[in-house]
Amino acid sequence: MDRLKEIAKNLDSKDELSIYRDKFVLPKNQIYLDGNSLGVLAKDVVDNVNYTIKEEWGNNLISSWNKSWIQLPRIISRKIADIIKSNEDEVYVGSSTSINLFKLLKSILEANRDIKNITTDSLNFPSDKYICEVIAKDFKIDFKFLDYGNDLKPDIEKLKEYISERKGIVVLSHVSFKSSFRYSVEDISKFCKDNNIIVIWDLSHSVGAIDIDMRSNG
């Protein structure tokens, strides 16, 4: 055990990301690995939130809308576009992932009444699955759930065969929240395009963590 600790300490000392540790509030003697549900608090956030509450809200009141707040969606959209390598006008900032997925599915189905089903798989995030089910029920179309029989990795060929037989909308998470399995956006998006299938990617567990190029892969 002592040898393993020494190996771990040695690897930590060479880790290029170790310089970022001091930028976060970390409880003493705790190893925290949950970054997708609630990540650790960045120290800068405390100062920024305090400034927003005390200065922008407390002192500037309604004038803060014109000074900075009203432009925030565009500013943040521009930053996200840089991270995922997409055009700025393709990024929308507002509401939660679930609400946005609901609105997106509803808009697609209202514009394409010939779509008869929505498909997702067992590696997708539960709330995405619930949204797909509800929308399918509202539009009186079929909800299809592909279960791989494990929580680790999908059977890509099985997925392709499944959605090609049930052409409609498929909703997938780019990175699985349980196993961190990473789907090939390029491969599956091309397959869907070639087979006249609409694919929606949830990037919640990948954006900012891994390199994403939606301009090339979309």
What residue ranges belong to the model's regions?
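Pyridoxal 5′-phosphate
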Residues: 1-218
